[in-house]
Amino acid sequence: MLAASRAALDKDQGDFWDSGRVASDESTWIRYDGKALASGQRVYWKVRIWGDAGQRSPWSVPATWSMGLLQPTDWHSKFIGSVRPEKHPEGAPLPFPWLRKTFNLAQQPARAVAYVNALGYYELYINGKKVDDHVLSPAVSDYSRRNLYVAHEVADYLEPGKNVIALWLGRGWYVRGHPGVVHDGPLVRAQLAVSMPDGAVSEIVTDDTWRVRESPLSPLGRGTAFGDYGGERYDAAKDLPDWNASTLDDSTWQPAAVFTPPPVLTAAQMVEPNRMIETIRAQRVEPFPEGGWVVDMGKAFTGWLEIALPAIPK
């Protein structure tokens, strides 16, 4: 049973779809046969089953899902990124960008959904707080065929008055030399759909009114072939602890540049996100003969390092 509201579902009113009892040996991939659902629509549902002897189970605990953006025309935002030339000298570092946009809300929203479609990786922040536990998001795709977006429920991160939505982009696999990559990236388009208690809906979309600044991170290596993955360079002199806070004065930041990547399919990410699941400690640290240090973590892993460095006397 599917309903447009929790209240209707609690009254056993399946105003979207009430399948009734269906005699079938199928328990998954049941075809939906109800009313047409719209982009961004929230659906409330529950299910029950019958046994061989005709006994009926109680209803399941009510659950919800939200429809994604079903048509290309549902995207009202533009791809944006750093102001930079289309070409650069081989190996020149291109710092990963910070992007942000401030806006005001008259009251606490009833619902807010952020849709983020990044070419490369992204982290989404609202009012200084990261909105999820995802890392290396979105999942990898073939940029010549499709790119992926992720939807985030973010009403709890918003507040009446001044707010800021911010994105930290990373290169990921969006690198020249890979199929479908024509910019030096990374790029992102995003839109925040805000629904007020009175039913009014507004959108915050990525465009050239967003502000951009270089973050402390830039890539090492080109990342275009096996064995050329490189790494990252961190420039602490560029660090700005409150870069994603609504109190920051971003008047010195540059306007974001708008880009037009080749049109390919944009699809919702239909796999679980990457998450950090474990913290491990180094087993051995020793100097490397050619300079630098060798850090032995004791086992193979996918992740990154956290290093505490001594303060440099001024």
At which residue positions do the language-model features occur?
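Solvent-exposed, conformationally flexible loop/turn segments
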Residues: 25, 40, 160-161, 288-290, ...
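Exposed aromatic-hydrophobic patches
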Residues: 29-35, 150-156, 296
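Accessory beta-strand-rich segments of carbohydrate-active enzymes
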Residues: 41-46, 51-53, 66-71, 94, ...
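Non-cytosolic beta-sandwich-type ligand-binding/adhesion modules
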Residues: 1-16, 48, 129-131, 298-302, ...
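Recognizes extended acidic, P/S/T-rich segments that occur
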Residues: 1-42, 48, 52-58, 75-82
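Activation corresponds to long, low-complexity, non-globular regions
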Residues: 201-298
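Terminal edge beta-strands and adjacent linker/stalk segments
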Residues: 60-64
